[in-house]
């Protein structure tokens, strides 16, 4: 979920996914999950492209999450993507995003953002894929999640110290983040829910075009 200076939940999108709000479709050999959720505010035009491609144009939105990835996440997955367009005007993340259960954890690996860079309780750093990421944790109480509207869960964050350049192929070696989190006592759950490379935004405008494999 988003953690901005103002109290709102951009992750509400993912949190509210509960079955009816998200759709999964077989879209490529390497990706099988298409996520498209909006709270109804503003205009969000999302396109489920061929293969692992998706695009989204948004204007004066509330909260939305659009992305492609996998129905079942993995701690061992290497995510490749190309953000040919990444142009947020306001709050937004370009991020690997997903959930685990047992325990219930919401996690982010944020490669770029708009006007706000997320933070939390600082735990350390991890070097991966040509960049250094700050590690944070946050906790949500009585908040929406994949398990209901009023749950308590922890969020794990790896946030790149500087925005990652876009427009060329990029890699997120997720295992590096998982191992770094473990070293700080941040253990993910044993039951993996979806895992997507997402465009997430709140009260903003912009456009993105991302291919995931």
Swiss-Prot record:
The active site is at residues 106, 200. GO terms for biological process: xylan catabolic process. It catalyses: Endohydrolysis of (1->4)-beta-D-xylosidic linkages in xylans. It comes from the Bacteria. Residues 1-28 form the signal peptide. Pathway: Glycan degradation; xylan degradation. Disulfide bonds: none annotated. One of its GO terms (molecular function) is endo-1,4-beta-xylanase activity. PROSITE patterns: GH11_1, GH11_2, GH11_3. Its EC number is 3.2.1.8. Belongs to the glycosyl hydrolase 11 (cellulase G) family. This is Endo-1,4-beta-xylanase. It comes from Niallia circulans (Bacillus circulans). The lineage of its organism: Bacteria, Bacillati, Bacillota, Bacilli, Bacillales.
